Structure formats: structure tokens, C-alpha cells
């Protein structure tokens, strides 16, 4: 997942499209989420993290601020979508299996393509469950 380190660059985009919700898959250590929360640009924050230990750390790091979901994004994205309104949303999507980033595993250690490279499934779930015409992905 690419790190968001310059929320000022997002400001014009967020204001132009009246973005209210921020959804991140593959939240990892939460560094990007921290930048987003502190930016004050969004009203609602949602993050999906596969690794249970990292998920627990995220919940402790952002109590009562971010709604976190623990599991594969293909399983948790429907839950996220059920918990956001139809306001314009910025989806910051992960595009790979996190094993090599955090667990020292090879990218090909996960044989299920939908888990190893979740981006296509995430896009499908989002587009089938909401009007994406006002969202940014």
C-alpha cells in the first residue's frame, strides 16, 4: 500500500468532490490512516487489515475514531459498505497480499489470487454495491 504522506495534495480533490468517507484496505501499521485522520478532511474513516496483531494495534491506536475490520478485504468490504452512507467516498485500495511486507512471506505464498491480489475483487464488490459515480478510487 502506498503511504499517504501529503494530505494537502488531497485537499482540493476532497473539497471539489465533497468527499466525506475514507476507506482503506490493507491499513497495515496505520501510518497513512494517521495522516488522513489528522488532516481533518474526512468525516468517517474505515480500515481493513488482515493481520490480527496489526488489527489489534490499530484498534488501540485509533480508539473511537476509525472503524476497523479484521480479515480479507473480499470478505470485509461488504461490511464496510454496509456501514457507510452514500456520501462521496475515497477508496484507498491495497493491491497485494501483505505477507511479504509484514510477515516475511513471498508474494506467491498465497495461492488464492483473490487473496494475493485483492484489487480486482475489491473493485467488483464496490461497483456492484454502490453508485460509484461520485466516489474516488
Describe the residue ranges of each PLM region.
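A short alpha-helical cap/connector motif
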Residues: 1-90, 96-137
Amino acid at each position: 500500500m502506498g503511504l499517504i504522506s501529503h494530505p494537502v495534495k488531497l485537499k482540493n480533490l476532497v473539497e471539489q468532490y465533497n468527499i466525506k468517507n475514507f476507506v482503506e484496505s490493507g491499513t497495515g501499521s496505520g501510518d497513512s490512516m494517521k495522516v488522513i485522520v489528522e488532516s481533518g478532511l474526512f468525516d468517517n474513516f474505515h480500515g481493513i487489515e488482515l493481520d490480527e496483531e496489526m488489527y489489534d494495534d490499530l484498534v488501540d491506536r485509533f480508539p473511537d475514531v476509525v472503524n476497523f475490520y479484521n480479515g480479507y478485504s473480499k470478505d470485509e468490504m461488504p461490511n464496510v459498505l454496509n456501514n457507510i452512507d452514500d456520501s462521496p467516498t475515497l477508496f484507498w485500495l491495497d493491491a497485494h497480499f501483505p505477507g511479504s511486507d509484514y510477515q516475511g512471506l513471498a508474494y506467491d505464498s498465497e495461492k488464492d489470487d483473490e487473496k494475493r491480489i485483492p484489487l480486482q475483487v475489491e473493485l467488483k464488490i464496490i461497483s456492484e454495491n454502490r453508485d460509484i459515480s461520485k466516489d474516488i478510487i
